[in-house]
């Protein structure tokens, strides 16, 4: 594990006070509100000296809303870029409209596929579909494809067994999915199913996904599969989806949304996605670089807040991150091994915390790695990040 973090975490648990403000100092600090720019910039973050390891809390607060509007439709990353949008972080809808040209696919998290009985399937969540928003995104970004996430929800083991063992069930499932895509003017789907099924049924799942892809491709629709990391976090063991499965599905599917985040746990706090682990996940999947362009390296636009006293963690999105920087003005530290920033702060009654959240530098390093490996990226999710992140894409 990361030596620097071990030292920090020991200090948190033992109650070190060397970086804690006195009450009088805290009152003085609170009286000086940190400023936030509300206007666009005529230069991207790369030209403003902001993509650095030595960042300051006040600079993040000041600059995070200020993106380069004149280049909002220009791409800096040549590979595939998939961006997820969720109804519970609605700012992502605006991000997709403003920066849509920087993406090849946008995936709204709207839909669930449910089995209602023998050869009976239903896609729920259609009440969340926003046709006006879809038209607006495509109006400003001509080449972008709208591919909603389709989650296999409330499936029992018997549901999977009955479907995977029946060609008629698979055909009916594929028809249902293709028909909804046609009716709703979707360009395909991001399918999330792999992590919900035990490994002994993966042969049948590959068979089903192959048939589903054939049906959707006949309708000129895309199929992207969400896959877990190929290397289990914190170990050298292979994950649930490895080179064996990738080799079978890569010629058939259009992409793979690789979940290279959530590396650390509340029991072992640390970085969200260490760089060496990300690299290993890609290399294990495709060691010969045959299908690398179909791998979409997962980038988290959220962070984690670890509480030392409670042995717990909570996700952190952009607004909370900025507010924490305002309230505590912490010293932000660069972990060179993981290539991520983190900081420590203390709540009045809640004990000590450490926060890992993406920064311009950590994202730039990962985009450079994606270029080196020849892969695309997938972002979870657009409503959780800071606006100036998109200058990098």
UniProtKB/Swiss-Prot annotation:
Statement: the UniProt record of this protein carries the keyword Secreted: yes
Q: Which residues form the signal peptide?
A: 1-19
Q: Does the keyword Cell membrane apply?
A: no
Which ranges carry the GH18 domain?
79-393
- BP-aspect Gene Ontology terms: carbohydrate metabolic process; innate immune response; negative regulation of cytokine production involved in inflammatory response
One GO MF term: chitin binding
- Where is this protein found? Secreted; Lysosome
* Keywords recorded for this protein, A-Z: Immunity, Innate immunity, Lysosome, Secreted, Signal
Question: Superkingdom of the source?
Answer: Eukaryota
**What Gene Ontology cellular component terms go with this record?**
extracellular space; late endosome; lysosome; trans-Golgi network
Task: Sum up the protein's function in the record's words.
Answer: Saccharide- and LPS-binding protein with possible roles in pathogen sensing and endotoxin neutralization. Ligand-binding specificity relates to the length of the oligosaccharides, with preference for chitotetraose (in vitro).
Q: How does it assemble?
A: Interacts with STAB1.
Task: Give the UniProt family note.
Answer: Belongs to the glycosyl hydrolase 18 family.
Its recorded name reads Chitinase domain-containing protein 1
UniProt lists the gene as Chid1
């Amino acid at each position: 594990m990361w030596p620097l973090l071990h030292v920090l975490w020991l200090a948190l648990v033992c109650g070190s006070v060397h970086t804690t403000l006195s009450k009088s100092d805290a009152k003085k600090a609170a009286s000086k509100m940190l400023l936030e720019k509300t206007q666009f910039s005529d230069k991207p973050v790369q030209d403003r000296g902001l993509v650095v390891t030595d960042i300051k809390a006040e600079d993040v607060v000041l600059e995070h809303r200020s993106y380069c509007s004149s280049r909002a439709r220009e791409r800096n990353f040549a590979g595939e870029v998939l961006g997820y949008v969720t109804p519970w972080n609605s700012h992502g809808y605006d991000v997709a409209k403003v920066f849509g040209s920087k993406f090849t696919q946008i995936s709204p998290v709207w839909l669930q596929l449910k089995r209602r009985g023998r050869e009976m399937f239903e896609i729920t969540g259609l009440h969340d579909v926003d046709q006006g928003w879809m038209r607006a995104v495509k109006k400003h970004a001509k080449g972008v494809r709208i591919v909603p996430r389709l989650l296999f929800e409330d499936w029992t083991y018997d549901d999977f067994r009955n479907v995977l063992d029946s060609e008629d069930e698979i055909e009916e499932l594929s028809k249902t999915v293709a028909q909804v895509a046609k009716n709703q003017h979707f360009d395909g789907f991001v399918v999330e199913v792999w992590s919900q099924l035990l490994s002994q049924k993966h042969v049948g799942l590959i068979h089903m996904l192959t048939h589903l892809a054939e049906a959707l491709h006949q309708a000129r629709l895309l199929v992207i599969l969400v896959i877990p990391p190929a290397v289990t976090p914190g170990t050298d063991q292979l994950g649930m989806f490895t080179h064996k499965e990738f080799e079978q599905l890569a010629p058939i599917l259009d992409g793979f949304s690789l979940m290279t985040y959530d590396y650390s746990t509340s029991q072992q706090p640390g970085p969200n996605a260490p760089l060496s682990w990300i690299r290993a996940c890609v290399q294990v999947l495709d060691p010969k670089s045959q299908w690398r362009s179909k791998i979409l390296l997962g980038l988290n636009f959220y962070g984690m807040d670890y509480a030392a006293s409670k042995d717990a963690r909570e996700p952190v999105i952009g607004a909370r991150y900025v507010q924490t920087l305002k309230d505590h003005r912490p010293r932000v530290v660069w972990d060179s091994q993981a290539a991520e920033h983190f900081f420590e702060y203390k709540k009045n009654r809640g004990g000590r915390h450490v926060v890992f959240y993406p920064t311009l530098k950590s994202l730039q390093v990962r985009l450079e790695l994606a270029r080196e490996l020849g892969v695309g990226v997938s972002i979870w999710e657009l409503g959780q990040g800071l606006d100036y992140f998109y200058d990098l894409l």
